Amino acid sequence: QHGIEIMFDMVFNHTSTTHEWFRKALAGDKEYQDYYIIRDPKEDGSLPTNWSSKFGGEAWAPFGDTGKYYLHLFDVTQADLNWRNPKVREELQKVVNFWLEKGIKGFRFDVLNLIGKDVALVDSEGSNEKSLYTDRPIVHEYIRELNQASFGTLEDIITVGEMSSTTVENGILYSNPDRNELSMIFSFHHLKVDYKDGEKWTDQPFDFLELKRILNEWQAGMSDGNGWNALFWNNHDQPRANSRFGDPERYPFETASMLAQTIHLLRGTPYIYQGEEIGMTNPDYDDISSYRDIESHNAYRELKLAGLTHQEAMRIIKQKSRDNSRTPMQWDSSRHAGF
Protein backbone atom coordinates (compact mmCIF):
# COMPACT_ATOMS: atom_id res chain seq x y z
CA GLN A 1 0.00 0.00 0.00
CA HIS A 2 2.78 2.45 0.89
CA GLY A 3 5.48 1.08 -1.41
CA ILE A 4 7.61 -0.16 1.48
CA GLU A 5 9.56 -3.35 0.80
CA ILE A 6 11.47 -5.67 3.15
CA MET A 7 15.20 -6.45 3.16
CA PHE A 8 16.39 -9.58 4.97
CA ASP A 9 19.72 -10.04 6.74
CA MET A 10 21.26 -13.29 5.50
CA VAL A 11 24.01 -14.86 7.61
CA PHE A 12 25.68 -17.27 5.20
CA ASN A 13 29.23 -17.42 6.59
CA HIS A 14 28.22 -19.60 9.54
CA THR A 15 25.35 -21.33 11.31
CA SER A 16 24.51 -21.78 14.95
CA THR A 17 25.95 -24.88 16.58
CA THR A 18 22.33 -25.75 17.44
CA HIS A 19 21.44 -25.79 13.73
CA GLU A 20 20.15 -29.08 12.35
CA TRP A 21 23.15 -29.38 10.02
CA PHE A 22 25.68 -29.04 12.83
CA ARG A 23 23.76 -31.44 15.06
CA LYS A 24 23.78 -34.04 12.29
CA ALA A 25 27.49 -33.46 11.80
CA LEU A 26 28.13 -33.98 15.53
CA ALA A 27 26.07 -37.17 15.40
CA GLY A 28 28.55 -38.60 12.90
CA ASP A 29 26.86 -37.85 9.56
CA LYS A 30 29.85 -37.41 7.26
CA GLU A 31 27.78 -35.62 4.61
CA TYR A 32 26.98 -32.85 7.07
CA GLN A 33 30.47 -32.83 8.52
CA ASP A 34 31.56 -31.61 5.10
CA TYR A 35 29.15 -28.67 5.52
CA TYR A 36 31.61 -27.18 8.01
CA ILE A 37 35.34 -26.51 8.26
CA ILE A 38 36.57 -29.33 10.48
CA ARG A 39 40.25 -30.12 10.85
CA ASP A 40 42.59 -32.43 12.74
CA PRO A 41 45.01 -30.87 15.22
CA LYS A 42 48.63 -30.43 14.23
CA GLU A 43 51.04 -33.30 14.82
CA ASP A 44 52.07 -31.75 18.13
CA GLY A 45 48.43 -31.71 19.25
CA SER A 46 47.98 -27.95 18.93
CA LEU A 47 45.08 -26.26 17.14
CA PRO A 48 44.86 -26.58 13.32
CA THR A 49 45.98 -22.93 12.91
CA ASN A 50 46.88 -20.04 15.18
CA TRP A 51 43.94 -17.93 14.01
CA SER A 52 42.03 -15.75 16.47
CA SER A 53 38.29 -15.35 16.78
CA LYS A 54 37.06 -11.84 16.00
CA PHE A 55 35.35 -11.93 19.38
CA GLY A 56 38.53 -12.82 21.26
CA GLY A 57 40.26 -16.12 21.99
CA GLU A 58 40.98 -18.92 19.52
CA ALA A 59 39.08 -19.49 16.28
CA TRP A 60 38.88 -23.27 16.81
CA ALA A 61 36.76 -25.32 19.21
CA PRO A 62 36.60 -29.07 19.87
CA PHE A 63 34.24 -30.89 17.52
CA GLY A 64 32.49 -33.08 20.05
CA ASP A 65 34.68 -35.94 21.28
CA THR A 66 36.17 -36.67 17.85
CA GLY A 67 39.54 -35.10 18.60
CA LYS A 68 38.98 -32.72 15.69
CA TYR A 69 38.22 -28.99 15.73
CA TYR A 70 35.72 -26.77 13.91
CA LEU A 71 36.41 -23.23 12.75
CA HIS A 72 34.49 -20.29 14.21
CA LEU A 73 35.79 -16.90 13.11
CA PHE A 74 33.18 -15.35 15.39
CA ASP A 75 31.55 -16.77 18.53
CA VAL A 76 32.12 -20.40 19.52
CA THR A 77 28.39 -21.02 18.86
CA GLN A 78 28.79 -19.87 15.23
CA ALA A 79 30.44 -22.59 13.13
CA ASP A 80 31.84 -21.47 9.77
CA LEU A 81 30.30 -23.09 6.71
CA ASN A 82 32.39 -24.84 4.05
CA TRP A 83 31.50 -22.95 0.88
CA ARG A 84 33.82 -25.20 -1.14
CA ASN A 85 31.16 -27.88 -0.80
CA PRO A 86 28.70 -27.42 -3.73
CA LYS A 87 25.88 -28.85 -1.59
CA VAL A 88 26.30 -26.00 0.91
CA ARG A 89 26.07 -23.42 -1.86
CA GLU A 90 22.96 -25.11 -3.29
CA GLU A 91 21.31 -25.11 0.14
CA LEU A 92 21.95 -21.39 0.55
CA GLN A 93 20.64 -20.66 -2.93
CA LYS A 94 17.43 -22.42 -1.91
CA VAL A 95 17.16 -20.18 1.15
CA VAL A 96 17.36 -17.02 -0.99
CA ASN A 97 14.85 -18.37 -3.51
CA PHE A 98 12.45 -19.34 -0.72
CA TRP A 99 12.30 -15.73 0.46
CA LEU A 100 12.16 -14.34 -3.07
CA GLU A 101 9.02 -16.40 -3.60
CA LYS A 102 7.59 -14.78 -0.45
CA GLY A 103 8.08 -11.33 -1.98
CA ILE A 104 11.26 -10.18 -0.23
CA LYS A 105 12.90 -7.42 -2.29
CA GLY A 106 16.32 -7.05 -0.71
CA PHE A 107 19.10 -9.00 0.99
CA ARG A 108 21.95 -7.85 3.20
CA PHE A 109 24.62 -10.56 3.29
CA ASP A 110 26.59 -10.74 6.53
CA VAL A 111 30.44 -10.82 6.28
CA LEU A 112 30.14 -12.21 2.76
CA ASN A 113 33.78 -11.65 1.82
CA LEU A 114 34.90 -14.20 4.43
CA ILE A 115 33.30 -17.23 2.74
CA GLY A 116 36.26 -18.17 0.53
CA LYS A 117 38.56 -20.02 2.92
CA ASP A 118 41.28 -22.04 1.23
CA VAL A 119 41.36 -25.85 1.38
CA ALA A 120 44.77 -25.75 3.07
CA LEU A 121 44.55 -23.43 6.07
CA VAL A 122 47.89 -22.09 7.26
CA ASP A 123 49.15 -20.21 10.30
CA SER A 124 49.20 -16.44 10.20
CA GLU A 125 52.49 -14.62 10.46
CA GLY A 126 52.24 -11.30 12.23
CA SER A 127 49.50 -9.05 10.86
CA ASN A 128 48.54 -11.07 7.77
CA GLU A 129 45.83 -13.19 9.41
CA LYS A 130 42.81 -11.45 7.87
CA SER A 131 44.27 -11.82 4.37
CA LEU A 132 44.21 -15.61 4.79
CA TYR A 133 40.41 -15.70 4.72
CA THR A 134 39.26 -12.24 3.53
CA ASP A 135 38.51 -11.30 -0.10
CA ARG A 136 39.94 -14.54 -1.47
CA PRO A 137 39.54 -14.58 -5.28
CA ILE A 138 37.06 -17.47 -5.18
CA VAL A 139 34.57 -15.31 -3.24
CA HIS A 140 33.69 -13.52 -6.48
CA GLU A 141 32.89 -16.84 -8.15
CA TYR A 142 30.63 -17.85 -5.27
CA ILE A 143 28.73 -14.55 -5.34
CA ARG A 144 28.23 -14.68 -9.10
CA GLU A 145 26.96 -18.24 -8.77
CA LEU A 146 24.53 -17.17 -6.04
CA ASN A 147 23.45 -14.20 -8.16
CA GLN A 148 22.73 -16.34 -11.22
CA ALA A 149 20.90 -19.01 -9.21
CA SER A 150 18.67 -16.67 -7.20
CA PHE A 151 18.28 -12.89 -6.92
CA GLY A 152 19.96 -12.17 -10.27
CA THR A 153 17.05 -13.80 -12.11
CA LEU A 154 14.81 -10.86 -11.11
CA GLU A 155 15.23 -7.20 -12.02
CA ASP A 156 14.01 -5.40 -8.90
CA ILE A 157 16.08 -6.99 -6.11
CA ILE A 158 18.57 -4.97 -4.06
CA THR A 159 21.59 -6.73 -2.55
CA VAL A 160 24.27 -5.39 -0.26
CA GLY A 161 27.30 -7.22 1.07
CA GLU A 162 28.87 -6.54 4.44
CA MET A 163 32.55 -6.59 3.50
CA SER A 164 34.94 -6.83 6.42
CA SER A 165 38.34 -5.15 5.87
CA THR A 166 37.88 -5.01 2.10
CA THR A 167 39.57 -2.68 -0.39
CA VAL A 168 38.29 -0.15 -2.91
CA GLU A 169 39.51 -2.46 -5.68
CA ASN A 170 37.48 -5.38 -4.36
CA GLY A 171 34.55 -3.09 -3.59
CA ILE A 172 34.39 -2.24 -7.28
CA LEU A 173 34.48 -5.92 -8.25
CA TYR A 174 31.69 -6.76 -5.81
CA SER A 175 29.37 -3.92 -6.90
CA ASN A 176 30.06 -3.01 -10.53
CA PRO A 177 26.84 -3.97 -12.38
CA ASP A 178 28.80 -5.56 -15.21
CA ARG A 179 30.20 -8.13 -12.74
CA ASN A 180 26.79 -9.61 -11.82
CA GLU A 181 27.62 -9.88 -8.13
CA LEU A 182 25.92 -7.38 -5.76
CA SER A 183 24.16 -4.03 -5.94
CA MET A 184 26.42 -2.36 -3.36
CA ILE A 185 28.67 -2.98 -0.37
CA PHE A 186 29.19 -1.86 3.20
CA SER A 187 32.81 -1.03 3.99
CA PHE A 188 33.98 -0.10 7.49
CA HIS A 189 37.28 1.74 7.20
CA HIS A 190 35.65 5.06 8.12
CA LEU A 191 34.46 3.49 11.38
CA LYS A 192 37.98 2.55 12.48
CA VAL A 193 39.33 6.10 12.77
CA ASP A 194 39.09 5.85 16.57
CA TYR A 195 41.10 2.60 16.73
CA LYS A 196 44.63 2.93 18.12
CA ASP A 197 47.10 1.04 15.91
CA GLY A 198 44.17 -0.86 14.42
CA GLU A 199 42.91 -2.07 17.81
CA LYS A 200 39.23 -1.49 18.56
CA TRP A 201 39.29 -1.74 22.35
CA THR A 202 41.38 1.37 22.98
CA ASP A 203 40.62 4.84 24.36
CA GLN A 204 41.38 6.91 21.29
CA PRO A 205 39.76 10.13 19.94
CA PHE A 206 38.69 9.85 16.31
CA ASP A 207 41.01 11.25 13.65
CA PHE A 208 39.00 13.77 11.63
CA LEU A 209 41.53 14.15 8.82
CA GLU A 210 41.78 10.38 8.44
CA LEU A 211 37.98 10.14 8.33
CA LYS A 212 37.88 12.76 5.58
CA ARG A 213 40.64 10.98 3.65
CA ILE A 214 38.87 7.61 3.80
CA LEU A 215 35.49 8.99 2.72
CA ASN A 216 37.15 10.75 -0.21
CA GLU A 217 39.14 7.64 -1.19
CA TRP A 218 36.02 5.47 -1.32
CA GLN A 219 33.89 8.10 -3.04
CA ALA A 220 36.44 8.76 -5.78
CA GLY A 221 37.60 5.18 -6.18
CA MET A 222 34.17 3.59 -6.38
CA SER A 223 32.99 6.28 -8.80
CA ASP A 224 35.98 5.75 -11.08
CA GLY A 225 35.37 1.98 -11.15
CA ASN A 226 31.56 2.20 -11.40
CA GLY A 227 31.12 0.57 -8.00
CA TRP A 228 28.44 1.60 -5.52
CA ASN A 229 28.73 2.46 -1.83
CA ALA A 230 26.22 1.81 0.91
CA LEU A 231 26.44 4.97 3.05
CA PHE A 232 26.04 4.68 6.81
CA TRP A 233 27.23 5.75 10.24
CA ASN A 234 25.28 3.37 12.44
CA ASN A 235 24.37 -0.30 12.58
CA HIS A 236 23.85 -3.04 15.15
CA ASP A 237 27.61 -3.48 15.63
CA GLN A 238 28.64 0.16 16.04
CA PRO A 239 28.44 2.83 18.76
CA ARG A 240 25.98 5.64 18.11
CA ALA A 241 27.52 8.12 15.65
CA ASN A 242 26.19 11.15 17.54
CA SER A 243 28.22 10.16 20.60
CA ARG A 244 31.18 8.99 18.54
CA PHE A 245 31.70 11.88 16.12
CA GLY A 246 29.83 14.83 17.61
CA ASP A 247 28.86 16.62 20.80
CA PRO A 248 25.28 15.57 21.57
CA GLU A 249 25.32 17.20 25.01
CA ARG A 250 25.97 20.75 23.77
CA TYR A 251 24.98 20.45 20.10
CA PRO A 252 22.44 17.62 19.65
CA PHE A 253 20.66 19.11 16.61
CA GLU A 254 23.85 20.27 14.93
CA THR A 255 25.55 16.92 15.50
CA ALA A 256 22.69 14.86 14.08
CA SER A 257 22.18 17.24 11.15
CA MET A 258 25.87 17.27 10.25
CA LEU A 259 26.12 13.48 10.19
CA ALA A 260 22.87 13.07 8.24
CA GLN A 261 23.91 15.59 5.60
CA THR A 262 27.22 13.84 5.14
CA ILE A 263 25.79 10.48 4.10
CA HIS A 264 22.74 11.86 2.28
CA LEU A 265 24.80 14.11 0.02
CA LEU A 266 27.47 11.59 -0.97
CA ARG A 267 27.38 9.19 -3.94
CA GLY A 268 25.73 5.96 -2.84
CA THR A 269 22.66 4.63 -1.05
CA PRO A 270 22.14 5.88 2.54
CA TYR A 271 21.06 3.43 5.25
CA ILE A 272 19.33 4.70 8.40
CA TYR A 273 19.56 2.62 11.57
CA GLN A 274 16.72 2.59 14.10
CA GLY A 275 17.00 5.51 16.51
CA GLU A 276 19.23 7.49 14.17
CA GLU A 277 16.24 9.55 13.03
CA ILE A 278 15.76 10.91 16.57
CA GLY A 279 19.45 11.39 17.33
CA MET A 280 19.91 8.54 19.79
CA THR A 281 23.16 8.43 21.75
CA ASN A 282 25.17 5.80 23.62
CA PRO A 283 23.81 4.67 26.99
CA ASP A 284 26.05 5.28 29.99
CA TYR A 285 26.21 2.01 31.93
CA ASP A 286 28.74 1.89 34.75
CA ASP A 287 28.96 -1.87 35.20
CA ILE A 288 29.80 -4.64 32.76
CA SER A 289 26.79 -6.62 34.02
CA SER A 290 24.54 -4.11 32.21
CA TYR A 291 25.97 -5.27 28.88
CA ARG A 292 24.84 -8.40 27.04
CA ASP A 293 27.22 -8.28 24.07
CA ILE A 294 29.62 -11.24 24.22
CA GLU A 295 32.35 -9.23 22.47
CA SER A 296 32.14 -6.54 25.17
CA HIS A 297 32.39 -9.09 27.98
CA ASN A 298 35.42 -10.72 26.33
CA ALA A 299 37.04 -7.32 25.82
CA TYR A 300 36.40 -6.28 29.44
CA ARG A 301 38.04 -9.47 30.66
CA GLU A 302 41.09 -8.96 28.43
CA LEU A 303 41.40 -5.28 29.40
CA LYS A 304 41.38 -6.20 33.09
CA LEU A 305 44.00 -8.91 32.45
CA ALA A 306 46.11 -6.25 30.73
CA GLY A 307 46.17 -4.28 33.98
CA LEU A 308 43.45 -1.68 33.45
CA THR A 309 41.25 -0.67 36.37
CA HIS A 310 37.50 -1.24 36.28
CA GLN A 311 36.95 2.46 35.54
CA GLU A 312 39.53 2.48 32.73
CA ALA A 313 38.10 -0.67 31.15
CA MET A 314 34.52 0.61 31.41
CA ARG A 315 35.48 3.91 29.77
CA ILE A 316 36.52 1.92 26.70
CA ILE A 317 33.50 -0.41 26.85
CA LYS A 318 31.17 2.61 26.99
CA GLN A 319 32.76 4.02 23.85
CA LYS A 320 33.06 0.88 21.74
CA SER A 321 30.43 -1.69 22.82
CA ARG A 322 28.03 -3.03 20.22
CA ASP A 323 25.30 -2.71 22.85
CA ASN A 324 25.45 1.06 22.33
CA SER A 325 23.25 0.52 19.29
CA ARG A 326 21.10 -2.25 20.78
CA THR A 327 19.29 -0.38 23.55
CA PRO A 328 15.54 0.42 23.37
CA MET A 329 14.28 3.79 22.16
CA GLN A 330 15.29 6.43 24.71
CA TRP A 331 11.91 7.74 25.89
CA ASP A 332 10.72 9.26 29.14
CA SER A 333 7.54 10.50 30.85
CA SER A 334 7.71 14.06 29.50
CA ARG A 335 5.54 15.53 26.74
CA HIS A 336 5.66 13.42 23.54
CA ALA A 337 7.62 10.79 25.53
CA GLY A 338 10.70 12.97 25.30
CA PHE A 339 10.88 12.96 21.49
Put a short name on every predicted segment:
Residues 1-339:
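Active-site and adjacent substrate-binding regions of carbohydrate-active enzymes
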